Amino acid sequence: MRTAPFADDPNSESFGGAVALHEPFWAISLMQNLAKYVYKSKKWFEAYHFIPSNSPLRLNADTKLVGVAFAPDTVLGGIDTPNGRVELLQMVGITQRELDWLREDPTTQRVESLIDMMRKDNPLLITNLKRTKEYI
């Protein structure tokens, strides 16, 4: 998950002027919860899957983002390992309206369509908790 850079990070580059005031510990917590889900359920995520977070992505924050979609990471791509190729994914935050739209037709093609719309404005799919624009 790529997030808006935080203000105290001297090595970060701003995307569209968005800057977070604090380190994105909420993103680490979200990824830990998703890892627990995968471990317990034995279900993994692939490109163009989505999942609700059942709460705002960051608790006690004014954000419309309540779920994540998974997309191929166009920057990192994939890596070849002795056990085969691994395609790297990234998560991007989605709003309730976008989540509801995906649930109407929960196919990878529909998620890909949403991701394509998002990439037009945000090619790196940076998750900005302050995002108010909805793509559907």
Question: What residue ranges belong to the model's regions?
Answer:
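Acidic, proline/glycine-rich low-complexity IDRs
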Residues: 1-136
